[in-house]
């Protein structure tokens, strides 16, 4: 049985309404898992735990990336089969773009850790990863908002909160760039090389 046959059987098995729900839930909860892993990683710096790339904190972050990537793949199936339109289609496309950015940034983050060792909160891989996080949360929000499924609509406040948290996380990290050494000095100890800009 070829991969194409398996893909066709899976895409025929799932109803579009179920897949749309899965895309939005995976995009939102994947974002929450990523933020949780990122905050946990920052806390581990405060505790001065040893740092290497495949820590449990990074595994948590990249579990979230896997969730949003799964949302992107499922969303791609819906778009290819032309089962979406309007705001729903726009939301799915945003999730796909966000998950692609996260995958590319995650690979770059792994390479960066291999080359430079510990990197800070502000690095050439972290901010694109966080931007992809915002896109996934935004796409999930748009999907939920445009959907008529009342069960799924119950997640709307949670999706708004997730989007706000994702924007806040990127905003905090970008404030380190604007504040430069003044902001970095008090938190340098906490985040080890938290203000390193690669």
Language-model features and meaning:
Residues 31-45:
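Alpha-helical transmembrane segments of multi-pass membrane proteins
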Residues 1-19:
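Short, Lys/Arg-rich, polar N-terminal cytosolic tail immediately upstream
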Residues 52, 85-94, 108-161, 172-185:
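Membrane-interface helix-loop-helix junctions at boundaries between adjacent transmembrane segments
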